[in-house]
Amino acid sequence: MTTLKLRLNLPSNQAEQVERVQVAVKRKQAATETMEEAWARILAMKNSDTDRQRLLEVKRAMEAGKIGRSPADAGKRFSKAEALRLWRQLAELERERKIAELVAKTPGNYRLITNEAQFESLLEALKNEPMIALDTETTGVDVYEDKIVGISLTLPRADLHVYIPIRHDQGEQLAPDYVLDGLKPVLEDDAIGKVLHNAVFDIHMLMSHGINVAGLRWDTQTAMSLLNENEESFALKDLATKYLREPSDTFETLFGKDAKFNTIPLDVALVYAAKDTHLTWRLYEFQRHHLSKMPTILKYYEEVEVPLLYAVVDMERTGFLIDVEYAKQYGEEMRRDIEAREKALKEKLGDINLNSPAQLKPALERIVGRKLESTDAKKVLKPLKSQFPVIAELLEYKELVKLHSTYISVLPELIHPKTGRLHARFNPMGARTGRFSSGGNGVNLQNQPKSARKLFVAPPGWVILGGDFSQQEIRCAAYFTQEPALLEAYEKGKDVYATMAADFYGKPYEECGDGTPERKAMKIGVLASLYGTGPTTLSQQLGCSVEEAKEFLDQFFAKYSRVKRWIDETKAFCQRHGFVWMDKQQRKRRLPEAKKRPKNWEERGEVARALRQGPNAVIQGTSAIQTKTTLVKLHELCKRKGWKLLGTIHDEVLLLVPETITREDVAEFERVMLESYRFGNVPNKTDIEIMRRWGEGYSVDEWFANKQKEESA
């Protein structure tokens, strides 16, 4: 029997109907897929770790009956997108459950202060407290613009943890001025000790509300850095979970990323805010217990790191005045220079995008006549710039582009609209060695190039007084190593690099002065030896072969044997104990990898890296102690004189002082710089400049000579 094949040429509208029927059939078939089959299909997809975790949470919740599909989706094929929508619902349900549980389990000694009788009773109780924990809840993190929503306090002696709401959207609460005026005498009383977590922020916020917090005794965030600088997180909730065995959710986990504390209901706000100071107090007790077993560290913390936080607050609040008009003019000149350089480079390299490695690499390979590993400036291009002028021009062009786009055009945009200043943030625990870092608010003062520093100016009637710790780390190395060549140079007040270069290369001292290749090589070599820099990296820094760099290091260590001995002894101590001490055992740098017995090449590299860091950490960490101790003393000087701390950048300290400053004032500043912290028998030195514009300074003699001319004119 012959099978007939019919070909139907249907009108287009009928074809569409057939297609719709076929889609409906497929949809019906998909709808008959079991949930088990659907999950198998979805989990077999290429999912990120985060998505997979969320999908599994939804699967378990659906199987437990905690969540289900909406009626609108019931007839559709179960998809990954729907599953992730369900995860968001599940997360919301979990947030609501956690919040309800928190409120239900609110401890009896957590009190909400919402009327005058309760507040007056609290003020009476505070009179009996030698120390309290303090925290603020705010509308945001802008310490100059945002508002305090509420204040939480822990009263250990009374065993009370209270929250005082003052700007919540709903609920009975006291007027902000009434509460702040009432708390002001307590918070400004130095006799009542204060414990905070991230104290700088809260001190800033309260200062913006007319309260100058006195009596800071402890900051659990900075104290943690002395107990373990290698913590993954210094957030209160993370530390409480880890050390107090008190699992605590973050604000974002409980309330969502964009939530504002003023929108949180008061019963919820109480348990969250009061728990913050409760945990802060418990963490303080934990930290003090452990630091009391290390009395030298505890003494350093209380005498330097704690008072330093007040200096940090004042530095940040002072802020920098930016010369906006100069920035515009300088930026326009720079833009024209960049365009001219770009045009000249394209004439030599071709009409390419100079910022595209894919286009730049082949163009450069044609110039150098060989393949290049990459267009990396430091590793590949800098070693070639002396041979190929076009590469030197390219590097200059890239530096200009970076300077313009990262600094000159950006700095004026970072001026705070309320204060008219650029406010950097200073983190006294920015590096694990204890060195400062500067960041936040979009500006990093540590990497401001000299050209960009011109934008920072003193306000009318003021000047910038700057002093550096001259050759701070090398003086520190001289102290630890007691290397005769270093000690002799400093005792005689000579340039240490020139002295060592003359000794090392067998040349007269006068021929190894500033700017000579010998002095430059010695400066790089000394720092490289202290920091464990290998021959490969040193060869790039010196612009020589690896063999020549290795020979330099061998000769250096042979000639300066005490440096080598100290480095070896420090590494041996680190390998035995897994840490190194800073000067006078005031801080530790923990390097646990140094104690490992390596089982493979990767672990061997980790051990070698940790051992290299040991001597480096001692030098950098002890230098940081000198800087911080001096800053505390300078802060005291500023308060006496009516001056202002402006900033600390690398080994430089900046102050704002009246332009009527006298030689006696400068001498007092110099004494503090030189005498606050000594490296044993190694004399300190500071180079002082007086500036109207940062980076364009006068020596002390030049400044006062100019002043004398102006007055006599």
Protein language model features and the residues they cover:
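Non-catalytic nucleic-acid-binding interfaces of large nucleic-acid enzymes and RNP effectors
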Residues: 2-88, 162, 230, 337-463, ...
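A common structural junction motif
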Residues: 560, 671-681
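Catalytic palm active-site di-aspartate
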Residues: 219, 276, 280, 308-317, ...
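Mixed-charge, glycine-rich, non-catalytic linkers/tails in nucleic-acid processing enzymes
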Residues: 214-215, 242, 249-353, 481-491
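Acidic, glycine-rich two-metal-ion catalytic cores of nucleic acid-processing enzymes
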Residues: 90-94, 105-113, 128, 133-142, ...
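Active-site-proximal helix-loop-helix substrate-binding element of RNase H-like nuclease domains
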Residues: 6-13, 28, 39, 43-46, ...
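Core structural elements
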Residues: 198, 248-249, 272-288, 295-321, ...
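Catalytic palm subdomain of template-directed nucleic-acid polymerases
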Residues: 226-229, 313-338, 477, 534-547, ...
